[in-house]
UniProtKB/Swiss-Prot annotation:
Homohexamer. Inhibited by UTP. This is Uridylate kinase. It comes from the Bacteria. It is an enzyme of class 2 (transferase). It is found in: Cytoplasm. GO terms for cellular component: cytosol. One of its GO terms (molecular function) is UMP kinase activity. ATP binds at residues 13-16, 56, 60, 163, 169, 172. The lineage of its organism: Bacteria, Pseudomonadati, Pseudomonadota, Gammaproteobacteria, Candidatus Palibaumannia. Pathway: Pyrimidine metabolism; CTP biosynthesis via de novo pathway; UDP from UMP (UMPK route): step 1/1. UMP binds at residues 55, 75, 136-143. One of its GO terms (biological process) is 'de novo' CTP biosynthetic process. Belongs to the UMP kinase family.
Amino acid sequence: MTIKPIYQRILLKLSGEALQGKNNFGIDTNALNRIVQEIKELIKFKINIGIVIGGGNLFRGTLLAHLGIQRVVCDHMGMLATVINSLAIRNTMLHININANILSAIPLDGICELYNLDKAIDLLEKNIVVIFAAGIGNPFFTTDSAACLRGLEIGADVVLKATKVDGVFSADPKIDPDAILYDQLNYKDILKQELKIMDLTALTLAHDNHLPIRVFNINKPGALWRVVMGKKEGTLIYTPKINKVNYNI
């Protein structure tokens, strides 16, 4: 049986920590190369790929905020950290012949282009990976919110939230060995159980616009491919309008 992807256009949300690998700070080239290779496997299936990357591997605004630096300034610094990560991802992609472009929410002439929706759609339709940098360009909004916003703007079928855990659990599995890994959840379940997956702004944006989110472990080799091919992987978050997934097992 020929395996076909269940999504044709995705928004991949990578945390900055995903690029850390086993390090405590910065970019682990082994982790970066592995993630990019997995993305390349999807390109073979002509899947349109947009990426939003966090900056937590380089900068944590909450730490400086406690030292008295203004929140707005901290958020601006965080935006620049996402640009650094975006440059690293694109450069790695170009080395293995993946055509990719960076569109930044803030002007950075000479470094990357300014975000423009028409430009983004045009690139995606040409099977060029689009990396969305600098969040949404405004303070007080997380990169998770940016991922949901960009996902909606480009008409993504799903937001794939790549994390360091296998999906959404009923409790912290590091603390509670009996924690249950959920296969699928609707947004109301998440709010009712106060599960910490994304900030409320991001979740509300996705919920109100019927945008499904799948949470999975990017550190598991092949997990990204399995998610896109409809294999049982991670946790799907959906609204009642979205049918639950029938897996290609």
